[in-house]
């Protein structure tokens, strides 16, 4: 009986350890939020009030490899209803794509980060 109980405890702990937490699980009323990408050197910085997004890259190789570049500088709130936490990014299975959600109005955008010329933010209708 004791072995079965120990086995069940180990099994339940292993299930909990394998559970994945969604990227957006952390709730905050902050103006800016960093999102991890599958590339260890790259993050996406989101203005949670306006939906504006920047690609941020860091490096240990030197300053020429560190940069912050615009993905979308369009204020998607158009100046109305700007409140922290209005916009949030969600990972997709494609490492270069995220979904941007307007949590108040329900609008969505495809966000693609990458090299110059590959970056885009497209409204999903």
Regions found by a protein language model. Name each.
Residues 4-13, 17:
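Sec-dependent N-terminal signal peptides
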Residues 21, 58-84:
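A low-complexity, Ser/Thr/Gly/Pro-enriched, surface-exposed linker/loop concept
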Residues 21-39:
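Short N-terminal segments immediately surrounding and downstream of signal-peptide cleavage
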Residues 41-48, 97-103:
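Short beta-strand motif characteristic of blades in beta-propeller domains
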Residues 42, 50-53, 60-62, 107:
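Primarily extracytoplasmic ectodomains and periplasmic/lumenal surface modules that are beta-strand-rich
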Residues 56-57, 111-112:
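Tandem-repeat architecture and repeat-register "anchor" residues
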Residues 73-107:
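Short, solvent-exposed interaction modules
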Residues 114-125:
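C-terminal partner/receptor-binding element of secreted or periplasmic proteins
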């Amino acid at each position: 009986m004791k072995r079965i109980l120990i086995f069940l405890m180990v099994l339940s702990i292993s299930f909990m350890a394998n559970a994945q937490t969604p990227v957006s699980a952390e709730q905050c009323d902050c103006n800016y939020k960093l999102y991890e990408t599958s590339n260890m050197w790259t993050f996406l910085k989101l203005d949670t009030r306006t939906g504006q997004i920047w690609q941020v890259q860091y490096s240990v190789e030197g300053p020429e490899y560190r940069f912050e570049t615009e993905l979308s500088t369009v204020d998607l709130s158009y100046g109305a209803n700007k409140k922290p936490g209005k916009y949030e990014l969600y990972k997709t299975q494609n490492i270069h794509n995220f979904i941007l959600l307007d949590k108040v109005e329900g609008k969505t955008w495809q966000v693609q980060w990458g090299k110059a010329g590959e970056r885009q933010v497209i409204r999903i209708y």
